[in-house]
Amino acid sequence: MSTYVVVGLQYGDEGKGKITDVLSAKSDYVVRYQGGNNAGHTVYVGDEKFVLHLLPSGVLQCKGKCIIANGVVVDPKAFISEVEKLEEKGGRTDHIFISRRAHVIMPYHILLDTYREEEHGGTQIGTTKKGIGPCYEDKIARVGIRMIDLLNPEILKEKIEKNLRIKNALFEKYFEKPTLSFDEIYNEFLAIGQKLKDRIIDTEIEINEAIKDGKNILFEGAQALMLDIDFGTYPYVTSSSPSTGGVCSGAGVPPTALQNLIGVAKAYTTRVGNGPFPTELNDDLGEKIRQIGHEFGATTGRPRRTGWLDLVSLKHACMINGINNLVITKLDVLTGIDTLKIATKYLTEDGKIIDYFTSSTTKLYDYEPIYEELKGWEEDITKVRCYEELPENAKKYIEFIEQYLGINVYLVSVGPERSQNIIRKEIF
């Protein structure tokens, strides 16, 4: 048995999709276990760019099965759209399956998400308005619609009627917006169920049988630990657990089955939307990193906020996830910067120096990062494939991260293409 979990360690957009794409070529199964189509995974095959939101990033390379597990919330219309686009480009799609237990994002979830963000105005959480949060709300409230319900006309009818009574009252009385039609939603989703029926399976049985048979299984997270509902910068977080722990409940596997826990972090830090960001660069250098790194959201197109690498938050993320293999991406973006800074401690508002990540989101706005400075490099590293061929200062940068975290960096990414990696050890 060989299991691999790929998780983000910052605020998303670390390059998990590329790493998953690389690892999936050797995988028998690729499994997404949380989130929804609020994710944005960009992978390249030659000059062809694929932006995936709901499908696992490994769908392009995996020779076995790609599974959207029970912890994912599924917009079936978005799923069908992505599958069709993949087919148009000649991609294989007959190996993609969805858990019967996965909850369905309904039209009223998307509207709720949108109306709430509009109402919040300047205090927006910064959601993608894809209905993710409201769908998870209904799941916890035990009124959600699951994929298996799309295959049962009577259950689907009952659940949509019950939900629309509440949601339409909310739309009309509170938001002063138009109500939704039961007939339109019911007929549309009944038809969707028939279209997808051969893809809707008991994924937890499939996955656990594969573990028992010693297959290579890659679990793919979306978003990242600093957006985790419990351990992120609450409330500026997502509605699920993008941690390694989320694999167990999100895919239905025991913790004893998880072996290789791979954490992915950029060589600097980015964030989309609102929330504290201690090392943020609101200057020309921040803009330079944004442009060189093409830091614009794959899902929303929003410019990402940029800043120096924050090892305080990274240590927190590695601890919660139990990371035993580290990946550093976009090292090439830092080329040409004379002096590089890495945050190793925070100075609190009352003058204390701390090296741990606080649970108080409001205090983070007042914390000042304490930096270590390292010399940069000028050499182009995008064609480097052997660690020893990196400039000395680039190696010192990587080794500083390793020493602080006490975790080995097994892979360094130096460009967006699949081949632009420096692999220091094989874990597959």
Language model: regions and residue ranges:
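Non-transmembrane, aqueous-exposed alpha-helical and coiled segments at domain scale
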Residues: M1-F428
